Amino acid sequence: MARLADYFIVVGYDHEKPAGPGEGLGKIIQRFPQQDWDDTPFPQGIELFCQPGGWHLSRERKQPTFFVVVLTDIDSDRHYCSCLTFYEAEINLQGTKKEEIEGEEVSGLIQPAEVFAPKSLVLVSRLDYPEIFRACLGLIYTVYVDSMSVSLESLIANLCACLVPAAGGSQKLFSLGAGDRQLIQTPLHDSLPVTGTSVALLFQQLGIQNVLNLFCAVLTENKVLFHSASFQRLSDACRALESLMFPLKYSYPYIPILPAQLLEVLSSPTPFIIGVHSIFKTDVHELLDVIIADLDGGTIKIPECIHLSSLPEPLLHQTQSALSLILHPDLEVADHAFPPPRTALSHSKMLDKEVRAVFLRLFAQLFQGYRSCLQLIRIHAEPVIHFHKTAFLGQRGLVENDFLTKVLNGMAFAGFVSERGPPYRACDLFDELVAFEVERIKVEEKNPLKMIKHIRELAEQLFKNENPNPHMAFQKVPRPTEGSHLRVHILPFPKINEARVQELIQENLAKNQNAPPATRIEKKCVVPAGPPVVSIMEKVITVFNSAQRLEVVRNCISFIFENKTLETEKTLPAALRALKGKAARQCLTDELGLHVQQNRAILDHQQFDYIIRMMNCTLQDCSSLEEYNIAAALLPLTSAFYRKLAPGVSQFAYTCVQDHPIWTNQQFWETTFYNAVQEQVRSLYLSAKDDNHIPHLKQKLPDGQHQEKTAMDLAAEQLRLWPTLSKSTQQELVQHEESTVFSQAIHFANLMVNLLVPLDTSKNKLLRASAPGDWESGSNSIVTNSIAGSVAESYDTESGFEDSENSDVANSVVRFIARFIDKVCTESGVTQDHIRSLHCMIPGIVAMHIETLEAVHRESRRLPPIQKPKILRPALLPGEEIVCEGLRVLLDPDGREEATGGLLGGPQLLPAEGALFLTTYRILFRGTPHDQLVGEQTVVRSFPIASITKEKKITMQNQLQQSVQEGLQITSASFQLIKVAFDEEVSPEVVDIFKKQLMKFRYPQSIFSTFAFAAGQTTPQIILPKQKEKNTSFRTFSKTIVKGAKKAGKMTIGRQYLLKKRTGTIVEERVNRPGWNEEDDISVSDDSELPTSTTLKASEKSTMEQLVEKACFRDYQRLGLGTISGNSSRSKPEYFRVTASNRLYSLCRSYPGLLVIPQAVQDSSLPRVARCYRHNRLPVVCWKNSRSGTLLLRSGGFHGKGVVGLFKSQNSPQAVSTSSLESSSSIEQEKYLQALLTAVIVHQKLRGSSTLTVRPALALSPVHGYRDKSFTQSNPKSSAKEPVHNQGVWASLRSSTRLISSPTSFIDVGARLAGKDHSASFSNSTYLQNQLLKRQAALYIFGEKSQLRSSKVEFAFNCEFVPVEFHEIRQVKASFKKLMRACIPSTIPTDSEVTFLKALGDSEWFPQLHRIMQLAVVVSEVLENGSSVWVCLEEGWDITTQVTSLAQLLSDPFYRTIAGFRTLVEKEWLSFGHKFSQRSSLALNSQGGGFAPIFLQFLDCVHQVHNQYPTEFEFNLYYLKFLAFHYVSNRFKTFLLDSDYERLEHGTLFDDKGDKHAKKGVCIWECIDKMHTRSPIFFNYLYSPVEVEALKPNVNVSSLKKWDYYTEETLSAGPSYDWMMLTPKHFPYEESDVAGGAGPQSQRKTVWPCYDDVTCSQPDALTRLFSEIEKLEHKLNQTPERWHQLWEKVTTDLKEEPRTAHSLRHSAGSPGIASTNVPSYQKRPALHPLHRGLGEDQSTTTAPSNGVEHRAATLYSQYTSKNDENRSFEGTLYKRGALLKGWKPRWFVLDVTKHQLRYYDSGEDTSCKGHIDLAEVEMVIPAGPSMGAPKYTSDKAFFDLKTSKRVYNFCAQDGQSAQQWMDRIQSCISDA
């Protein structure tokens, strides 16, 4: 029996202690009983909870309120405080202040009857009967307010003395003595929560998804806060949420109603469920880690910082469906054609139970089989049970599931295990459900009707629990009169006579003592075990664990023990692969266990090695998240298997399997320990059957049954018998169990010593402080870090071994074991004496073990080493020397699957055993595949040292020795990755020496230390030029300081020096320019110093002679760009000349010695002009279009105001007085630009170019004013991700045969540069219309947007500025890193979504190529169309070089030859100063800058063009790969330095033929020429150039192809780019190719793509024929004929007939040889037909000349007649846009056959941009001119075409053609 109420309290307003403005305090007026009960202390702070919103006086008479507050005491017992609050008139106001009264202040005195103070009647109980308490308090209030003639003292005394029965379904009728009759109904089960209707109400308030989120939040220990305007609703919501957790119990702060004064509790770090009134919601919204539920608004707010774990599928979906069926039954029939009249919901009480039943089923499924994972540690005196979490998660298949992991680690689940773990206790509904009904739940999930039926069955039981007696007795409780609280004169609540109440309570208690106690005896039973744990998802058993694989493991073990070495070697690799499966690992432990039982544990050395390898392989995958079963099963085996090393010295297996992190995972040891203890306890009670000394332990079971009894079954029996045993017997049992646990603890301490103390104590890999960071897994980091940290602490003085050299190892092991012993022994109830004795034993065990291991270690080193593969010496290149001899390593796969067998098939070439070599040129691995079945193949992976981009130390799993090894991962810019694990024999010192040597050769002190100069010659000394003293003193000093500052990473001195040379404006602009000096380590002062007169080593005359021989000048002569002449000998026709003013590199350090400038410019003015450009890179001509006469110019970006400001300020006075230096520079620059512009225009006129004349289609008035500046660049990221369309202006520009042929020549050039491809809307903006009407400029200046933003240039200057944005260097570097990660990922990605193509797309590489090619194509098109181009982007040596060189390649066929491409690279890249050394990090000072593949991007762009136009290039793709490889290899001197000036300084610019001793390294071009002469290795057999306009490749991202250079690999000999230089007899992979004799030997050979060089193994037909001819000539002793002479003979014989101007060429390749291999888009016409005029009929067909595939229209035109019926009429019409109303010219075709009016961007366009169906045309009528129409157009030229959908507005060229169009269309409509 229990008291119904513990305390009754009256709490009122405290007038004496005001809390603050507008707020008061409450105080306890009376409490009953006055003394605390012994078992229940009086709750503190009850006055705060009576008024949670604060104590306030009121002006209104308010209704009485009731709510229940829950308080939790220090023992976690809950007290339910029911509060009934009413307001009574306040008579005495002397103690109050005006501020305390609610409402506004009013004038005059407040009448006493107008103020009301709250008073609360509180009932405190440990029982949860809210409705009974509401009735009792209501009754007391009724007696008071209605002045009933009943003593309040007797009511209170009866209430405090009333006793009610405990749970069990019994009823109790009672009365307080005021004419009431009340019934208390106790629930059937104490453990089941009582909810009434609160759960249904919560779902009604918040909805299914929100409640599920709150449910998951509470289970995963998040903070949950409710707020509502109702206190009772807060109580109900908290009660509901807590009840949904059943069978778990909430063990954190639970405060359904939180008072205002305690709001700071919300900031506590612990999880909670709290409710607050809505008036405080503004205060709680600032909480960052609290999930807030608004009960009144029906919403929940989950902060961003909280990752809310959700239920695992399929349970989440099933729960949602079940809840939906119950709460919204009408949803299922909502779509029925004939829905039922109404779908009845269950009444709220039953609905409440149905919802709870759903959650009960959910927990039954979630915890299915939990009892099979309980570990019994102790039975007596109290059961100690542990839950095997990892086993449960592993068997459920939810190891990775966040939700269940958090639930199992929570305090609620710990309580669940301790409460429900014991096998003999009272059972409830959940126990039955989880044991017997889970299978039924799973089966019924797919049948909603059966599921609902089961839910309702469970709901009935839950309902019956709360309402066990359906026929309840009549209840009567008087209620106050209606409106009684509004009475004017109500006396205050009377003071209760305390003595009388106390007396009555004592009398009632005395009566109850005599009554018999109606206590309910708890019925205990054996808890059913239930089904075993199964996976939550029904997964099909994978083939991985098939019977064949298990058989392989068994056979391998049999072969090992039978000493069948050959069979073992064959099966071992397959067995090791099979051990990745759990079943195979289990099979291994079972088989080894059998051999131990057969006393076959002594092994010879070979057997020992095999067994160790298999054990290591098995342990390799035992992570901390697995169930540890395998590692636990191997644990005793490691101490069983051993080999004899010497008499009395044996080596056990545990010494060789210590390198696995699982041995330092304390959770593993605990779990394994508990399992072992459980088995021992089970054995203890099973063996007791035959023990005569302990008769009470005998089991009354047949002999056959006791083996089947589990530990839990035995425990249940023991717990049942426990109360019947005598005290001595009980004590004996407790001692037996404790000794069992103690002995296991000693045993485990020994096992842990075995596995934690290393064989060589100087190499402790697991417990050394430096190790854990590399190998530990996340779950055991706490343990390992604490061990590692503890090494540094004071040593354990008890051990006595602190002064030995191994003391750190010994102490770290002792601490680890001591921590383990403390935890498991304390949990298992071992006495402190036993624990202390264990602590004393451990140091001795460790010390003895270390001593034993010293002998083992000594003897093991004397063993003959295991036969390892012989180290193969690598083949070296001429002049290459080995620096570091081979270090024995294991080459691991680099993340690509090709060489690993696996899913792609093929041999498993990797991992491979071999050696890592370092030579003066390469880092090189050579070895053989570890897989014996692959054969005797040699695996070679190498790359040049200079190409290394990243080198890092790694720790990796050595797959051969199955152990963790130190390793090295080296990445190369040649897209190779060497990832090796060092063998045990390689010491760390040797590895460090290797790395130091590697770094020494990676960043040599000077270029003469590189391999390019290492072919046996002496290092030439660098003789710095001597300068005149007067010029030298300050400059030399300054430069020295600046270089020193640059090394120290500071730029201050260089900037100060600049300040002295230039104005502050210029310097500040340079330094603060966005991106300036962020990524580039280029010194500000290095290339920007003012030119000085410098005297170089060579005399000026000899320098001039050598400069004239350079590629630059030869190309100027080829292009006819003027001659070298003084000012006096200028020839009139020349408007440009070649100046030698930079021959000593005094004008610009990064420019070539000879420059092309306007004839009118004096050399003396050039230095001042140069100052206006970054690094003095002034604008110079670099190429001329031989067809149009247009020029391409390049320069660095502008300084200061830039070119725009200069043009603008020509006629305006200077606003600010500047220095004479800037003034003169600005003036000279203005003159220079004016001369440049004049020369460009006149030059083009002299060339006879008609491109600047206005075309007839554009014969409109010029528009005065300024250019519209819409040529802007969008954000690189956003533009890259926009879909690129083939429509609109872009398509028209791209697909026209000549840009000039289209009237829309320069529409939207800027938009194209910005990456914006407009769709086929007829007019995108009015600015396009304006652009159309402007005449073409003579010069287009492509500059940075930031420099040209304010460009408003007068039209008279005849030039236009095109602002362009481009990718910065840091973006290029980042993209390259991502590209490398995609192509050589280093590890095979575990995430199936991270595919190669996705990674390639994420790298942003292709959008960057797209941007470069797009810019180059536009430049090329502008040049073709008669306008010159000046490119001045960034410093002028990165993107500028990419664009100018690519534009020249597209426009000039010469550069597409081998000799021409060399000229292009030498001129644009080498002479014009691309920073090769810096961008490729070749120099020592660019070490930290990162690799920027600017030149590689250019080569990739050339590769893209080559793909689309394979017949236009003399060289093949191998040539580009060769350059890509060697520009970073340092094999050649060509790409070593950053400018011609530096090359001249180092003496490598000119080959000094006179000095025989000073060899200056090898030039790549000479090497290429020799190779090209010797063989067609670089020749493109499809080469068949057509002398027409520039190439126009398709630059859409979708058209770009992945370059196979990034992914190809040749493991047989390494990259072929080094060996191809040598004669074929030196090829390392040609050795096996020589066939002996002409016998009938098979010529068949297996070709593996990742192993063999396919081009050599399977050459194309022509290469094969050439090699056959060479062999035949050799056999006939003839002098071999040069291959190109032979090729010319063949091609001459197959020449086709001469072509006429109108004939079409059908094949781009040579007929009979390659024409079939050329795709259709590569077959181009030799000469294009003349361009059509306006309104002309077309009578000839054209094939597209670009890289775009044939459109459907073109295919259609090939097969249909071209008579008037097909294209009856065509010509240009202006069409008005539907949306933006702009006029645009389009090429219209009237097609009678198809009854269509089609329109194109131009007459040559093959892609139809749209059509008008003539069937929809209603009329065609003349129209008047409208706004924005083309000027100078006749009013009669307009007509409208009205269709059923819209009206089209057209404008013809004149009235006559408009009438002609109307007639044609009208006749077409009439004919139809």
Curated annotation (Swiss-Prot):
Homodimer. Heterotetramer consisting of one MTMR2 dimer and one SBF2/MTMR13 dimer; stabilizes SBF2/MTMR13 at the membranes and increases MTMR2 catalytic activity towards phosphatidylinositol 3,5-bisphosphate and to a lesser extent towards phosphatidylinositol 3-phosphate. Interacts with SBF1/MTMR5; the interaction seems to be independent of the coiled-coil and PH domain of SBF2/MTMR13 and independent of MTMR2. Interacts with class II PI3-kinase PIK3C2A. Interacts (via DENN domain) with RAB21 (in GDP-bound form) in response to starvation; the interaction activates RAB21. This is Myotubularin-related protein 13. GO terms for molecular function: guanyl-nucleotide exchange factor activity; identical protein binding; phosphatase binding; phosphatase regulator activity; phosphatidylinositol binding. Residues 7-172 form the uDENN domain. Disruption phenotype: Mice are born at the expected Mendelian rate. Display demyelinating peripheral neuropathy characterized by slowed nerve conduction velocity, axon degeneration, and myelin outfolding and infolding in motor and sensory peripheral nerves. Defects in myelination start to appear at postnatal day 3 (P3). The neuropathy severity increases with age. No impact on Mtmr5 protein levels in mouse brain or sciatic nerves. Double knockout animals with Mtmr5 are non-viable, dying during late gestation or within a few hours of birth. The C-terminal domain mediates homodimerization. By mediating SBF2/MTMR13 homodimerization, indirectly involved in SBF2/MTMR13 and MTMR2 homotetramerization. The GRAM domain mediates binding to phosphatidylinositol 4-phosphate, phosphatidylinositol 5-phosphate, phosphatidylinositol 3,5-biphosphate and phosphatidylinositol 3,4,5-trisphosphate. It comes from Mus musculus. Keywords: Autophagy, Cell projection, Cytoplasm, Endosome, Guanine-nucleotide releasing factor, Membrane, Phosphoprotein.
